[in-house]
Amino acid sequence: WFRQELGGGMSFDELTAEAAEAPPGSDGVLFLPYMAGERSPIWNPDAKGVFYGLSFDKTRGHLIRSVLEGVAFSLEHNLRTAAETGIHVDTLNAMGGASNSVLWTQIKADVTGKTIRVPSSDTATTLGAAILAGVGCGIYGSYGEAVNRTIRMTRVQEPNPENKAVYDRAMERYLRLYEDLKEGFSL
């Protein structure tokens, strides 16, 4: 959406390079990524996308980075909700187009505090189907064996503790911003 409407025809790589010019936390700019309502974990079909914290000293780079961070905050919100139910995740695997961005993957690692592994194959659906078939046909004795024998990592990104501290504060603002705006979304 951002690239199409505000990106001025720039490529994803160009937008990401511009985002890298803004510091972690986007100097206070937050983006709620609820462009089509939001499902898990808030389940609010009326939620809207929001840029917050704009001032004349902010650049398009701040906006781009805040979009990347907003998606990462949504991921962290889901991980926190899962943890409340006893599901704890230590490592994340990132696949698909967004995983091609080293910056965005690093932002997700920093926000969540989790190691993120990026496999060499970005055809997750096809590979997943092949793994299911391989286990079903007895080629592999278990899903764990199938994964260990078929998936190779291109890179592993560890969270940066300094950035994590910045993002922890921003995450609390992100959650509070949604709560403060929630009633207005249905107007």
Q: Residue ranges of each PLM-predicted region?
A:
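Active-site core segments that coordinate phosphate-bearing ligands/cofactors
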Residues: W1-L187
